[in-house]
A protein has these predicted regions:
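Helix-coil boundary and interhelical linker segments in multi-pass alpha-helical membrane proteins
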Residues: 27-35, 77-86, 134, 154, ...
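Membrane-helix/interface signature in polytopic inner-membrane proteins
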Residues: 169-202
Length: 228
């Protein structure tokens, strides 16, 4: 993993040096601590832009809101037990569980919203309790919620880029199915579409964007990327 991070960051540093004298890039390319957040925001913007289209077309705003809050315990656990550079893996583990839960709840229109609300409240509440139970989190809790963009490390940048690519793959391979599901839900199911798989890919893509942004933008602000 370390060698892969080193290789990718060497390429990022070479790109930064190449852009130093290019008008419009001089500020962000002036130092590595400025260029890392810039690269992260570029990848996050591309992934969130495409995933956000599906979120709005399929009226999955509440799912996105639930995912944003529900990954919080994974972020807290990753930071407390494995170190700040393991925020993304910790959030990813919880995000997979939440994506499965939201997909299962989405199969029933009757319990969908109520069940989603329960998932949101339960996971987010557990994250708050965990963060307060483990000691003095003054300042740290706010950082986990709203992010610290200029403190992005090489490891977290690479992790976030990889997760953004997962989001793009998940939404890319199911793009046609997602559009069909959005425009004619019942017709798509009558045509033999695997609705559960399509829904899971949509939730997984949302989860990936949330996880990718967790270490920099913060879990609460990413909903603006997906919905607004």
């Amino acid at each position: 993993m370390d060698s892969a991070v080193s290789t990718i960051m060497t390429g990022v540093e070479n790109l930064r040096i190449a852009l130093q004298d290019v008008p419009g890039f001089r500020t962000v390319a002036s130092a590595p601590y400025m260029f890392r957040p810039f690269i992260m925001l570029v990848f996050l913007g591309i992934a969130a832009g495409l995933v956000g289209v599906i979120v709005n077309l399929r009226c999955m705003e509440f799912n996105a809101e639930a995912m944003v809050h529900s990954v919080f315990p994974g972020i807290v656990a990753g930071a407390l037990y494995w170190g700040i550079d393991n925020i993304v893996p910790g959030a990813a583990i919880v995000a997979v569980i939440v994506a499965i839960a939201l997909t299962w709840l989405g199969r029933s229109r009757r319990i969908n919203e109520a069940g989603t609300a329960i998932v949101l409240i339960s996971f987010f509440g557990f994250g708050i309790v965990l963060s307060l139970y483990k000691g003095d989190m003054s300042g740290q809790l706010e950082a986990l919620m709203f992010g610290r963009l200029l403190e992005v490390s090489d490891t977290r940048l690479v992790q976030s880029i990889l997760v953004c690519l997962i989001a793009l793959i998940a939404i890319g391979v199911s793009w046609r199915a997602q559009i069909s599901r959005a425009s004619a839900r019942d017709g798509a199911m009558a045509a033999g579409m695997n609705a559960t798989a399509v829904d899971f890919l949509a939730n997984a893509a949302i989860a990936a964007v949330v996880v990718a942004s967790s270490s920099a933008v913060g879990i609460l602000l990413v909903v603006g990327y997906l919905v607004v």
